Amino acid sequence: RLKHFIWETFSSHYVELVKARAYNSENRFTKEESDGARWTLYYCLENLLKLLAPVLPMMTYYIYHHLWKKDIHFEKFPNVNGKTIKGVTTEDITMLNSAIWRAKKDKGLGLRDDLSSLEVPLKFKPMEKDLVAAHRIKTLTYGELTISV
């Protein structure tokens, strides 16, 4: 389940969604927004390494020691913080990204090709800049899900 989360959810959906904000090469995001994305990626890397340490001891030791100059095997195992975020769920993001990627593929386009317009439910409003940057959306509106390639 951890491998599936890292590979299929975290990498495929979260990292793809925030990488434009983390790099901020086109200056679409404020410094605070960009720093927030990088901090979250850093936090996730640290905790994913701790979760993987029992099954990949040598690799996680090497990476963790290189980044933090500590032995990961003496660090505390991460705890669930119990916080939930209302609004957009992981399933919502996965469904939206998959629908966009499928629409582009069906039209013979690459994932980095522009999307002429996208209409999404209002709950995605806080992610507007990330969606536009990640999917190269020309026009984003709110309502029922409609994808125009």
Report the location of each language-model feature.
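Feature 926 captures the class I aminoacyl-tRNA synthetase adenylation module centered on the KMSKS loop
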Residues: 1-149
